[in-house]
């Protein structure tokens, strides 16, 4: 199953709608951005989401609250993560791999893919992370845009992520929307997909777009399972 991360949440109502629609991860941005949230609001959102999960015992998925940071001192990342009860932290800046050793929560490390970069180059860039944090590390691949640390709405060549997705848990971000998320899943087979601007209307999260995006992911997963079964039917 492809995990869905709804990033850039700034309102509790949108977080709850995402969870209700079947999101696996929600992202809260603690870096300079139009989607920046303060720690009090973030804590409120996380508490509401986890409270909803407790009330809805039928919900099978684990909801993972992710805090997104950019070049923030490790001590501050750990403080915010503890205060807001985050499950993971996403490092979307220029943090060196050794920095990960100082982070107390499981990590998602963003790596920006440059134009014309080859798949072997991407693999080489990700390999040191496994040595620093082991198999618990998740990688997020996003499009490299000069002066930007994500949320640009620009896509990269998904074919270069194929090899990485076979070896590591990889989330693909950048330019995703309801219309193209099925294609990236078919091409790269990632652990997860990340969306922010692709589910917004006039810069604000749109609940109908959130639902449509998640539905598109689940539909693609179902189609791929069906195709796999038809090629290799279970016998006996």
Stretches with model-predicted labels:
Residues 1-236:
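Conserved N-terminal beta1-alpha1 strand-loop-helix module at the mouth
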